[in-house]
Regions:
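C-terminal motif of bacterial Sec signal peptides marking the signal peptidase cleavage site
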Residues: 19-22
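Hinge/lid segment of periplasmic solute-binding proteins
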Residues: 38, 110-175, 218-222, 321-335
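Early extracytoplasmic/lumenal segment of secretory-pathway proteins
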Residues: 43-47, 52-114, 290
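Extracytoplasmic/periplasmic solute-binding protein
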Residues: 158-171, 176, 200-256
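Glycine-centered hinge/linker elements that transmit conformational signals in sensory
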Residues: 204-206, 251-285, 329-330, 334
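Extracytoplasmic/periplasmic substrate-recognition and gating elements
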Residues: 273-278, 315-394
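Long, aromatic- and glycine/proline-rich binding clefts that accommodate carbohydrate-like moieties
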Residues: 329-336, 383-450, 454-456
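Conserved C-terminal helix/tail region of periplasmic/extracytoplasmic solute-binding proteins
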Residues: 417-536
Length: 536
């Protein structure tokens, strides 16, 4: 009896091992190929995940774009899902990759797409679609007037090319700007230079923090609160500082270079200015615009895509009207180490098209994504903030040029700070740069900001920032963001295991034979059973 039980049990155990080994990888989609034609006899429902900056006008533009597109393509229905944070879109996409329930189109960033690409054929490479005569950029079969590939701003399109293909198209572009309370800077006896430098910003910020009245209030604003220099995205702060210094950040292949002597020197400098009360960050103190508009900040660095929140006449605000202080707002490039050769980051949302089992569904999604590049959508959306359109077709249009020309005509559509922010990027496209994109680049970006955040917090807590502190900081940030495990994260959030090792392959071969043994065993048992039945 024991012999009869042992063999099936052994085979079952070995089969379980085979199942576990099968978990090493997951089934991917088939590679996408462009259909010969779009099947208009079918109905399609596609999902579009988008971000809005808590801006109702942006939501209205999305909805109008969807309505107008559906009028052109009645057989394509678009469902919109809105987010207020790019990180949440990223996390939800990662979650849905494992169940093949990704959206058809989503607004995202190249760093995020690089992680999506660790899943097999998850994201649609767009080069063949770009070039398709009928449905590509400016294609002959399109029912709208979309841009040709030559009409895309080349620097913006290039940002969407990595891992050998274009995996996105740019939707909007922005950069960072320094929004300056010019009135307070001049009250301290300084004159703004043509190009901001780090030395100037630190000097003025230190002076503002040090100048107090006998009653303890700050001399420049007469208030008890003053944070002279506030930076919203400290990851960009560190990245731009390193770029301007010509120091290492990372290579295109993903080699981490950020832990260098220049980084350490920059962190010591930030610590020194923080100790004097000159510097803080969004994560530590709050939204820079709130302090700027209340007369509690002189230099507020934020995206040009946040320009409608900046200045004493800002149309959008998180503070009450009675907290506003009247001052002149200057919109300037981020501080530079070499003002003769300014360098600033290029950023902004891009459109990613996800692969599906049905290539017709992918084509329907591409038709919608491409519609978002039309002048109507590009110009309308760019006017909601200090964005710029990503096509020369839109930038050079009479409608957009008229919009720029009306800078300051009102404090809503033509709000001067917003249009100045857009012009800042338009004038500096050739001075922008992007960071390398690869699986893990998003983690390195977060780590860059974490270095500044941790140093700033430590100084405010009166902790010593010295060589021992720096060594510990580097170790903790490396561990937190797994920077010593390049490419270690797969699209589903698990470890990317890579090829099976030789012993595992041998085990799989052995287990393959188990199936044969099970079949033989089952056959033998069946023959024995029939023999016993015949003998009776």
């Amino acid at each position: 009896m024991m012999k009869k039980v042992r063999l099936p049990a052994l085979l079952l155990a070995l089969l379980s091992l085979l199942t576990l080994c099968g978990c090493h990888g997951s089934r991917g989609q088939n590679a996408f190929s462009v259909p010969d034609s779009f099947d208009e006899s079918r109905q399609y429902e596609i999902t579009f995940w988008a971000k809005n900056d808590t801006n109702k006008t942006q939501v209205d533009i999305y909805n109008k774009a969807i309505d107008d597109f559906q009028a052109l393509y009645p057989n394509i229905s678009v469902r919109l899902r809105l987010y207020t944070d790019y990180g949440k879109i990223y996390n939800d996409v990662i979650t849905n990759i494992a169940t093949n329930t990704t959206p058809n189109v989503c607004i995202t960033y190249p760093d995020h797409i690089a992680t999506y690409l660790t899943g097999a054929n998850v994201v649609t490479p767009l080069d063949a679609l770009f070039a398709d005569e009928q449905y590509g950029l400016g294609g002959s079969a399109l029912r709208y007037d979309g841009p040709t590939q030559a009409e895309m701003i080349p620097q913006f399109l290039e940002e969407c090319s990595f891992s050998g293909s274009h995996y996105a198209v740019p939707f909007m572009r922005s950069t960072e700007a320094c929004y300056v309370n010019k009135t307070y800077v001049e009250a301290l006896g300084y004159e703004l230079p043509e190009t901001l430098t780090w030395d100037f910003v630190w000097e003025v910020s230190d002076a503002a923090a040090a100048a107090k009245k006998p009653d303890g209030t700050f001399a420049v604003n007469g208030q008890e609160v003053l944070l002279p220099f506030i930076y919203k995205s400290t990851d960009n702060m560190m990245i731009q500082m390193l770029r301007q210094k010509g120091a290492g950040y990372s290579t295109d292949s993903g080699e981490v270079q950020i832990f260098n002597d220049t980084t350490e020197a920059l962190l010591y400098g930030i610590a020194a200015h923080t100790a004097g009360g000159a510097f803080s960050t969004f994560k530590i103190s709050g939204y820079p615009a709130n302090f700027l508009n209340a007369g509690q900040c002189l230099f507020a660095v934020d995206s040009t895509a946040g320009a409608t929140w900046m200045g004493s006449h800002a149309p959008l605000s998180d503070i009450s009207a009675d907290k506003y202080v009247d001052f002149e707002t200057a919109v300037m490039t981020v501080p530079q180490f070499d003002p003769a050769h300014p360098q600033m980051i290029s950023q902004g949302p891009s459109l990613c098209v996800f692969n599906k089992d049905d290539p017709q569904e992918v084509l329907a999604a591409w038709l919608f994504a491409q519609y978002l590049l039309t002048n109507e959508v590009q110009i309308a959306y760019s006017q909601t903030e200090g964005y710029v359109p990503v096509t020369a077709k839109a930038q050079q249009s009479a409608a957009y040029q008229d919009y720029l020309a009306q800078e300051g005509a009102d404090d809503t559509l033509h709000y001067d700070v917003k249009i100045k922010a857009s012009k800042l990027l338009l004038d500096n496209v050739d001075n922008t740069f992007t960071t390398p994109v690869y699986n893990g680049s998003a983690s390195l970006r977060n780590a860059a900001g974490q270095l500044i955040e941790d140093v700033t917090k430590s100084v405010r807590r009166k902790e010593p920032v010295d060589a021992a502190y720096m060594a510990k900081l580097y170790d903790s940030v490396t561990s937190l963001y797994r920077l010593d495990q390049r490419g270690a994260m797969a699209a589903d959030g698990s470890q990317a295991l890579g090829p099976l090792p030789a012993p595992a392959k041998a085990l799989l071969i052995t287990l393959g034979g188990v199936w044969v043994l099970m079949a033989v065993y089952g056959g033998v048992q069946l023959i024995k059973k029939k023999s016993r039945q015949n003998s009776h």
